[in-house]
Amino acid sequence: MLDIKITRTTSPKEKPQDETKLGFGKKFTDHMFVMDYTEGEGWHDARIVPYAPFPLDPATVVFHYAQEIFEGMKAYRTADDTIQLFRPECNARRFQDSADRLCIPKIPEEDFVQAVEALVDVERDWVPHTDGASLYIRPFIFANDVGLGVHASKHYIFCIICAPSGAYYAEGINPVRIYVEDEYIRAAPGLTGFTKCGGNYAASIKAGELAEEQGYAQVLWLDGVEKKYVEEVGSMNIMFKIDGKVYTAATVGTVLPGVTRRSCIELLKDWGYDVIEGKLAIADIMQAAREGKLEEVFGTGTAAVVSPVKELVWKGEHAYIGDGKIGPVTQKLYDTMTGMQWGKIPDTKGWIVPVEKKY
């Protein structure tokens, strides 16, 4: 267990007055969690301190070689003012997997969860009260050796920051248009596609901007070898309901193992659906659309939870899904997931972790 020292701010920030205008990641809370790593000493000096910049040398290796990882999760306020997390242990395990791939010392699962709970407890007044709004939590580690040699750092900083964030669907769930990217790729076997590291996201910006210029909300990524099998959409996993069955790419090294993805699969199986995790060719998806068998398409992720898709375009061909409306399975998943997260329905899966008042 971490011995977390807490230094509270003497200059608290003004909290947002209008929670309907929070946006995402624009305003940050009063405090942050910080812990240092030194080779030979390990992780040490766990602390919660006032939110502030890090003084870093221009030659700090993370600026040059991107040795860093991050996570994304949320804290929710229920109607009875309970603050709760959703499957934080899953984020902790994925954080370890990302660390291993980037040669970063791992944070023990229980320490990761304790650090998140402690910071959320200290910042519980920042968790929004508005329905659909939440406190976004961003844990991250970066290398902070100074020097230009290409090698694993001997020093790291683990930090967690929080940002109150508005409802993703402030005006209701509106299905989106997706562009199937067949030039740029997001990941390839042996690389870092299964991790949450900044390089993956930086490399996706170009294709995302080009798609946005054409009026599409997201990019659907194909595999990096043959460019024929679907993998992810934007920064989310994606699922296809075809002729009664649900298909999604397997997490075999090029696809991020999303916590929301995993949860949706478990729910779908509970409800009796066949869920096939494996290779699914974009050509087969388009053919299913032509035959009227492509019933629903939706992305899954922390930010949106479930994001319905109304249109795919690939090589100039358009596939229209569900008359442009959210499908019944997509809606049921969204209602069930958000219902548990905000405490509106019972947590029958044991996924919810209440944040106790300790700090």
Indicate residue ranges for each PLM-predicted region.
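Intrinsically disordered, low-complexity linker/loop segments enriched in Gly/Pro
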Residues: 122, 142-144
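Charged, gly/pro-rich active-site loop segments
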Residues: 109-111, 119-132
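Extended, Lys/Arg-enriched charged tracts that mediate electrostatic binding to polyanionic substrates
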Residues: 128-138, 142
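Helix-start/capping segments and mature chain N-termini
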Residues: 1-119, 147-359
